[in-house]
């Protein structure tokens, strides 16, 4: 047994290292930026080392467990542990955060605070994926809200205060339901609070209590995922945030809600989930079509990509609601796949904005010739977004479809309707994806403008783009790499149904 506190080190290192930024006497941005990148890279390497040498893929039980008494009066423990469900999101968090800090080079105002908030957000996002105590899960869930709010309010567009306020109202409001559900389930049936995930997983609850608590958690996770109609904060937030912040929001933050649905709603409240899963399937199907249709009507490039993220999250919701090992594995693959694709699309939209200072698609055009590298990478990522075979999104959506068909939970007519509606959404996806390419890169609007001069992607931007493209194509060719983490844990989760 390994007794070294790997997970505590991985969670604490970013925020502890970020605190040292304020001690730097150097005022230049370059030293601070590379220090931040090094902290993220060291944390990612530590995570990778711990998983490679101390994690057994064929063991569905919790591994790398840590348990330290934190508050004696409240009997509150600092509990960490991982399994096949959390290993993928943790690695995704480290990878995307490292690239996001590297992408934030144009930030020059209050750079010490900016990079500290990026590192604090890193710790706050790893925390929920590795927590094995439900109250610690809540604390970590709340910890990452503060950096996100400040990143939105201080670095963004003209309406950044409005979008930051809307974000905090939605997320803080949903956190009230999360706290009530956490305390309700932790204090049930005992004089002392029961907060350990393993203990909660082995308890049985009255169906009425299970449904009430399930709804509380569902609201909290539906805001973060997001699930319609609790999604309206997302387009405004993405439309105003700096693109490095958008990479963290699309790549990681949205996936926390989906992870919570599987980790808590499915694993702890199987009876309630069996009742609500048909509604999740219906909501997911509607979400795919609604968000894809709404994306077509957006003039703002970042808002169009944001609505495409909402649409793709619909597949994830369907996979969670299918209650089949195929569908749930597809949902987990979609978490990883869209984390890469969404982050990459927002990065490229930001690099385009740095050059043109334009976000409205009807004001763009003709960018393919002066910026061929950006055009090439954006085209490849658009193909990945519309689930082209050979890209990670193809297998994720295909396996979710197969999960619907093979699910034993639903009648044939329900399967046909869900599949038909979802297929319509998949037809809309290439329409808005190819529309972005047409409006941005084709035509002669900019190419014929007198005295126009553009810089194409530099080495830093090409490195970030290629770094994200490699796992997108790699997973598309060999998706079993992700399934090797999750398949045993998925069977353990579905054994409760």
From Swiss-Prot:
Keywords: Chloroplast, Membrane, NAD, NADP, Plastid, Plastoquinone, Quinone, Thylakoid, Translocase, Transmembrane, Transmembrane helix. GO terms for molecular function: NADH dehydrogenase (ubiquinone) activity; ubiquinone binding. It is found in: Plastid, Chloroplast thylakoid membrane. One of its GO terms (cellular component) is chloroplast thylakoid membrane. The chain crosses the membrane at residues 4-24, 35-55, 84-104, 111-131, 134-154, 167-187, 208-228, 242-262, 274-294, 305-325, 330-350, 386-406, 411-431, 463-483. Its EC number is 7.1.1.-. It catalyses: a plastoquinone + NADH + (n+1) H(+)(in) = a plastoquinol + NAD(+) + n H(+)(out); a plastoquinone + NADPH + (n+1) H(+)(in) = a plastoquinol + NADP(+) + n H(+)(out). InterPro entries: NADH_Q_OxRdtase_chain4, NADH_Q_OxRdtase_chainM/4, NADH_UbQ_OxRdtase, ND/Mrp_TM. It holds the Pfam family Proton_antipo_M. Its main location: plastid. One of its GO terms (biological process) is ATP synthesis coupled electron transport. It is a multi-pass membrane protein. Belongs to the complex I subunit 4 family. This is NAD(P)H-quinone oxidoreductase chain 4, chloroplastic. It comes from Lotus japonicus (Lotus corniculatus var. japonicus). The gene is ndhD.
